[in-house]
Amino acid sequence: MEVRASRGRIVRLVYVGACLLVLLHCWVSPAVGGACPKPTDEIETDRPDITNSSRVVPQGSLQFENGVNFTTPEKSNVLDGTNTRARLGIAACLEVLVDVPTYFATLSGPAVSGFTNVAPAVKWQISPIPGTIDLSAVAGIGLPTGSQALVGPGPQPYVQFPWSWELTAAWSVNGMLTAFFHPSDPVSKQVYESTLVLERKLSEKAGVFIEWIGDFPSAATARHLLNSGAIYRLSKTEQIDFHIGAGLNGEAPSFVIGLGYSYRFDRLF
């Protein structure tokens, strides 16, 4: 009974948090709406780095981000796809998003195969003024639709804060703080994740990055990963990307490589 009550409290807390994001957005959006992303802006995605963009998609735009990865966790070889995230700008500086279930196929080794959870969320871009530290707040939940052996039991709420700081016209520093809650897991109830990215803009269409990711489970050893990659915009609404990474300790995958393609439809409403 205590586990169910705790699970219900966390789910309700994330639900209330998502509602608060919407209410706060409605309160402050008239003052900052002019600085929010517009359909004339170039596409910005939450990939290929783990760190998500601090900017939302423009109001009335629908963006799909997709990719495939090859990783080597637990002395296994695993291929996963399509890592699809759908993002819809429902108001100025406000979007709803959903992570579509991704399939992990174990090619060799003891790693588990299966689908991940479907995970809806709300994202509010708090500080959209260029030249400052941009910050967004995200509240979401992984619904128990995937393979329990792969992702764990029960609903899995999370809160997240992506941020970015433009140092110069070419250099920027980005990061993200995330708290994942696993109320139905009998061992590890929370996982905290921190990321830090150094990004270099090569041109109006291309950029490269290097990233550190740290995962800190409440009842397990931390995992550290070094990730790097590049993006190239085929147009204002299309992007291809590439990333390659390596684990910094034994708990992280020893190797990861991936490719992605993203596109955006504008002025849908």
Indicate residue ranges for each PLM-predicted region.
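Transmembrane beta-barrel domains of Gram-negative outer membranes and organellar outer membranes
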Residues: 32-269
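Cleavable N-terminal export/targeting peptides
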Residues: 1-41, 268-269
